[in-house]
């Protein structure tokens, strides 16, 4: 928890504290719950024990200072995109984004993270990619099928050299009409984005990285 809260160089939470009008810190450690509150970087009381627990972890809650920032309203689309990236890069970490303003919750939980293996591991998501042996995207084909049962049949009848199978659970979200944050929180869409490999968005999308030139 110290590494995560401290940031890359151990100063992450210190900087956030200095730029916040208020910060609440709760630490669950060694069977006890500790808490401390800061206002504009100044502790309001010493670290104190407020209860007992069997859990471990750190919770940081902060309010950006209006004296420092001209805009203190969070953009949920930016947060969702960043948290989705982190969930891919940190295998086994479950990230939950709650927007209490409109009562929405997004869960990012990609147990396999990113992998360069032949069979792309997408554990924790509905559907698994059965990759092909061919490494040339121009010669590779991806077949999208509905459900694991259809996926099993397709895997048995495919040409393993050039045909990959990706089972998707149920009817996939219509991304043309969906909000961006809802789109990237969809497990099926996340699975598809990972399998295709070309990324999404203006900054990340790169058609040259597309892993299959034929998608059915």
From Swiss-Prot:
The UniProt entry, under PROSITE patterns, shows:
TOPOISOMERASE_II, TOPRIM
Every copy of the Toprim domain together lies at 140-216
Indicate the annotated site residue(s) for Interaction with DNA: 171, 174
TM helices/strands, residue ranges: none
Q: Which GO terms describe its molecular function?
A: ATP binding; DNA binding; DNA topoisomerase type II (double strand cut, ATP-hydrolyzing) activity
Q: What keywords tag this UniProt record?
A: ATP-binding, Cytoplasm, DNA-binding, Isomerase, Nucleotide-binding, Topoisomerase
GO BP annotations listed: DNA topological change
E.C. number = 5.6.2.2
Query: Coiled coil: which residue ranges?
Result: none
Q: Which SUPFAM superfamilies match?
A: ATPase domain of HSP90 chaperone/DNA topoisomerase II/histidine kinase, Type II DNA topoisomerase
Major place of residence: cytoplasm
Q: Which GO terms describe its cellular component?
A: cytoplasm
Reaction(s) catalysed (UniProt annotation): ATP-dependent breakage, passage and rejoining of double-stranded DNA
Q: Which Gene3D superfamilies match?
A: 3.40.50.670, Histidine kinase-like ATPase, C-terminal domain
The record's subcellular location field reads:
Cytoplasm
- PANTHER family cross-referenced by the UniProt entry: DNA GYRASE SUBUNIT B, MITOCHONDRIAL, DNA GYRASE/TOPOISOMERASE SUBUNIT B
Q: What does this protein do?
A: A type II topoisomerase that negatively supercoils closed circular double-stranded (ds) DNA in an ATP-dependent manner to modulate DNA topology and maintain chromosomes in an underwound state. Negative supercoiling favors strand separation, and DNA replication, transcription, recombination and repair, all of which involve strand separation. Also able to catalyze the interconversion of other topological isomers of dsDNA rings, including catenanes and knotted rings. Type II topoisomerases break and join 2 DNA strands simultaneously in an ATP-dependent manner.
For this chain, the family text in UniProt reads:
Belongs to the type II topoisomerase GyrB family.
| Quaternary data | Heterotetramer, composed of two GyrA and two GyrB chains. In the heterotetramer, GyrA contains the active site tyrosine that forms a transient covalent intermediate with DNA, while GyrB binds cofactors and catalyzes ATP hydrolysis.
What's the miscellaneous note? Answer: Few gyrases are as efficient as E.coli at forming negative supercoils. Not all organisms have 2 type II topoisomerases; in organisms with a single type II topoisomerase this enzyme also has to decatenate newly replicated chromosomes.
| Protein name, UniProt field | DNA gyrase subunit B
**What organism, scientifically named, is this protein from?**
Acinetobacter sp. (strain SEIP 12.81)
- Which lineage? Bacteria, Pseudomonadati, Pseudomonadota, Gammaproteobacteria, Moraxellales
Q: Which gene carries the instructions for this protein?
A: gyrB
